[in-house]
Amino acid sequence: TQDLLVRVSQAYFDVLAAQDTLTFVQAQKTAVSEQLASAKRNFEVGTSTVTDSREAQARYDLVIAQEIAAENDLRVKKLALDQLVGVTNAQPVPLAQPVPLPRIEPANVDYWVETARAQQPGVRQAAIALDIARLETQKAETGHRPTVDLQAGYNITRNPNGTLTAPGVNSRTNVASIGVALNLPLFAGFAVQNRVKETLALETKAEADLETARRNVAQATRSAFFGVQSGQGQVQALEAAEASSQTALDANKLGYQVGVRINIDVLNAQSQLYQTKRDLAQARYNVLLGTLKLRQAAGTLGLEDVQRINSLLAPAKQP
């Protein structure tokens, strides 16, 4: 169940990321198209060179290629989501704006590691396997030991025709017995010893499997925890970079209008802005998905965690 929740969430965010990429590429195409038209007008009136027009045309052609790739990627991601949820043409709801990303609570990696070592399904399964192996060893070792059986019986004998001493007299005899039997095992050709050795080997293997499971879970939990922390830092940095990129683009546009910047400066600033927007959107999805993966690694992922993610989505549009 936990694996299914993560896979569906992954496919859901993949579609949203692909939609964002297409949206940003189309917005960049519009901006480059306007810059291309401006470069052509300036060339016609003699205020710019043909190089400006050619640079803008080359950038426009590149964005067209990126748009085609983004459209195809979105189709592929939607097909993957449809196949996973069993719905044709599923329409994921985007994140609300602004996006209040959840914090890790508690923000202590040791807490999550200890929780994982105790509750992760793989660890619990390995612990149960070890308990079974120990019971099998104890069972095999009893082959060397004497056993005591409690025996009890009750017998009723009816004589409708009487007995030799009392012919013709109907009689019934009740006999009850109880006793204890002591069984001493004899030499059985090393069968018991071999069985004990086998169960001890299986017990040792089960102990090693449990320790391996605990180490793997601890490593996966730490990786997930630090991944979410790093992702949250990246989101903050990219939010600042987005604002800076927008300011840089505005400054380059103004500089181009007054003749202190050239066309390629504006085109590069546009590319930087929309690339930052794409990176920021992807980083947000990575944080949300990483939060689910952290809880999965700790063995605590449930529907309530998915519902908390759902609360961050924008209200669904009414038909």
Report the location of each language-model feature.
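Amphipathic alpha-helical coiled-coil segments
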Residues: 3-23, 34, 41, 77, ...
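Small/polar, glycine/serine/threonine/aspartate-rich low-complexity segments that form flexible
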Residues: 95-109, 138, 151-188, 195, ...
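Transmembrane beta-barrel architecture of outer-membrane proteins
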Residues: 10, 55, 147, 175-177, ...
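Periplasmic alpha-helical coiled-coil/stalk elements that build and connect Gram-negative outer-membrane
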Residues: 3-115, 227, 231, 272-274
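Structural signature of outer-membrane beta-barrel channels/translocons
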Residues: 73, 142-144, 183-187, 286
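Metallo-beta-lactamase
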Residues: 70, 121, 283
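Acidic, low-complexity, intrinsically disordered peripheral segments
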Residues: 279-319
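Acidic, glycine-rich loop-and-beta core segments that form the ion-binding/anion-interacting portion
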Residues: 92, 100-103, 108-153, 157
